[in-house]
């Protein structure tokens, strides 16, 4: 680990938390927001459109990171993040609102790629693994706080959740004060891209990692798209109750991510990812078959474990198996697949039938992904 202050670490973790809230912070108050903005399209789009923005702009950001460096890219991401997120409730025109949410996704991917590049440059080996685990915890803890606060504020006034985006401004001040402005020279990475065999291995290992990234976030975000409408209808939840329920998933993910280094040391990284998808399958299976709220909370625990064992670990695999010159590009692709998964979750609303079919289909897909990844990793051990 390079010389880095505690304030720098705190800054990295706080800024990381912004990536989870880009769409989800308004989720608990989504019915009220859709009604007041007179949004004519599928309600879930307001949550997932930033994800589509990430997908569109990720290739550009992946190239910019090598030209601008993480510090400049991060600063240029935080400013529009605050502005575009905040002005959402002013935009009564549906098409302007759609453009705003798409551009918010561009700001988000700039933040994610820049902050992960900082981690790659400032930390090495076990320290890097630990920091990525902490980053996963920070992201999910942000989910806990922002969903809870978003639900609470949404009950007071439908516009209040949009004010949370302004947190990017004090975080920008912390970035200016604590993070290095110049690129940091790195020691030779595990994969340098100098050897053709290593290049081939990198390409081969990245394919399932990117696929796993897509499905892990798509599966996770099914809850964000379906639960805001399902819980009030089935269990008479208020907006704040919905926010607390959904934030519980993130809380479990935080606790799981905190143990990720210990778990991977015992089971191995690739097996741990497969197990994470099995937990997803069990969680959504319970969501689909039960009408009891306490069983729903068991599903919350299982789903949270699934997320905590997949997305942070897949992020680590991208950093670990990327050469220095290809890391920015691979992180851009990772962001693209993660947020493409978020956007894809929108389309579960078009599955025929009620929420039962959505949850069961999600559980089945989770199982298939776990099996596929296990077979691939076994063959390429």
Protein language model regions, located:
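Helix-to-loop junctions at the C-terminal end of transmembrane segments
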Residues: 58-69, 256-268, 353
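Paired small-residue
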Residues: 95-103, 283, 294-302
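Cytoplasmic helix-loop-helix junction between adjacent transmembrane helices
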Residues: 100-139
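Helix-loop-helix hairpin linking two adjacent transmembrane segments in secondary transporters
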Residues: 134-177
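Central cavity-lining transmembrane alpha-helices of secondary-active solute carriers
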Residues: 48-62, 247-259
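Conserved MFS/SLC helix-loop-helix module at the cytosolic interface between two early adjacent transmembrane helices
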Residues: 56-93
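A late C-terminal transmembrane helix in Major Facilitator Superfamily
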Residues: 319-356, 362
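Juxtamembrane intracellular "pre-TM" segments in multi-pass secondary transporters
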Residues: 2, 180-209
């Amino acid at each position: 680990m390079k010389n880095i202050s505690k304030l720098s670490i705190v800054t990295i973790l706080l800024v990381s938390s912004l990536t989870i809230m880009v769409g989800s912070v308004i989720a608990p108050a989504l019915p009220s927001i859709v009604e007041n903005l007179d949004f004519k399209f599928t309600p879930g789009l307001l949550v997932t459109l930033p994800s589509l923005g990430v997908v569109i702009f990720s290739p550009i950001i992946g190239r910019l990171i090598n030209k601008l460096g993480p510090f400049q890219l991060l600063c240029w991401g935080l400013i529009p993040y605050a502005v575009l997120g905040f002005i959402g409730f002013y935009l009564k025109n549906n098409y302007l609102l759609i453009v705003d949410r798409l551009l918010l996704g561009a700001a988000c991917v700039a933040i994610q790629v820049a902050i992960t590049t900082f981690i790659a440059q400032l930390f090495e080996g076990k320290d890097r693994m630990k920091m990525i685990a902490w980053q996963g915890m920070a992201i999910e803890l942000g989910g806990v706080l922002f969903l809870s606060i978003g639900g609470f504020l949404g009950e007071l006034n439908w516009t209040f959740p949009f004010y949370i985006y302004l947190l990017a401004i004090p975080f920008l001040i912390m970035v200016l004060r604590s993070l290095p402005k110049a690129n940091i020279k790195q020691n030779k990475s595990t994969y340098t891209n100098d050897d053709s065999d290593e290049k081939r291995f990198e390409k081969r290992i990245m394919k399932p990692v990117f696929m796993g990234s897509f499905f892990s976030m798509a599966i996770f975000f099914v809850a964000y798209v379906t639960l805001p409408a399902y819980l009030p209808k089935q269990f008479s939840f208020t907006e704040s109750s919905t926010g607390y329920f959904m934030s519980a998933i993130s809380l479990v993910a935080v606790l799981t991510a905190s143990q990720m280094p210990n778990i991977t040391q015992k089971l191995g990284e690739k097996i741990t990812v497969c197990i994470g998808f099995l937990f997803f399958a069990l969680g959504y299976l319970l969501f689909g078959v039960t009408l009891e709220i306490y069983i729903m909370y068991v599903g919350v625990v299982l789903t949270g474990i699934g997320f905590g064992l997949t997305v942070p670990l897949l992020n680590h695999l991208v950093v670990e198996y990327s050469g220095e010159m290809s890391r920015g590009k691979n992180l851009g692709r990772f962001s693209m697949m993660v947020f493409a998964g978020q956007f894809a979750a929108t389309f579960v609303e078009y599955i025929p039938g009620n929420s039962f079919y959505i949850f069961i289909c999600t559980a089945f897909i989770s199982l298939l992904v776990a099996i596929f990844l296990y077979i691939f990793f076994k063959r390429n051990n």
